[in-house]
Amino acid sequence: MSEITLIEVDSAANPSVAVIWMHGLGADGSDFEPIVPELGLAESPAVRFIFPNAPYRPVTCNGGYVMRAWYDIISLEPDSRQIDETGLLESREIVRQLIQREEKRGIPSQRIFLAGFSQGGAVAYLSALTHPEPLAGVIALSTYIPEAKLITEDLSAANRHIPLFVAHGTDDDVVSIKLGRQAIALLGQCGLKPAWHSYDIPHSVCIDEVRDIGTWLNARISALEAAP
């Protein structure tokens, strides 16, 4: 695997499920580490949470300032983003390598979830919906789909019905809720049925949202355990 630093947290010993969770622009893998004990997974099989750090790169919309970013954002508009497609695809490759790493450690792809906040969620969307093997689900928080054609032209048959938890703040002034709803519309056009949640918050995560994520994740893990 190419060099990537990360944080790992196991909810209990001997995990049989994995969640690969991508942070937002300018943050790092520690950003969502505190969420693990708040998800209420004590009764579930053990889960390994992997929080990778995005590479450092200049971000055009921030004056070329170098920060952790999954891809360069060239311009910000209320209803769109101009991004560096190459960087987005490179980040998808990082996620694929992390999936392969978990498979080698004994967790099959169908027990691996992808999660992400803001641009990390965009990476989760693309990585999951174009992955050639079935995955367990996607948690997409305060995010968007910046390059629709990358998904529509390469939608994986293995993940055409993947479960999706999608959440957005109604007062988000960084990634507008309109962008989140555009993503929902695109997913619907692809035949997917995301579970949509909105909260009266800005570009952040709230405790009600965390509880809803935990409820959804517990239900999805229970479904995995019940599967033949």
Give, region by region, the residue ranges found by the protein language model.
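Short beta-strand/loop motif that positions the catalytic acidic residue
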Residues: 165-168, 172
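Short, proline-enriched alpha-helix->beta-strand connector loops that line the catalytic pocket
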Residues: 159-164, 190-192
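Serine-hydrolase catalytic machinery in alpha/beta-hydrolase-like enzymes
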Residues: 2-113
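Short alpha-helix in the alpha/beta-hydrolase fold that links the catalytic acid
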Residues: 32-37, 152, 176-186
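Alpha/beta-hydrolase-fold catalytic nucleophile elbow
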Residues: 52-53, 115, 139-142, 167, ...
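C-terminal catalytic histidine-bearing segment of alpha/beta-hydrolase fold enzymes
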Residues: 178-228
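Primarily recognizes the serine-hydrolase "nucleophile elbow" in alpha/beta-hydrolase
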Residues: 103, 108-159
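Short, conserved loop/helix-junction motifs that constitute active-site signature segments
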Residues: 41-44, 155-161
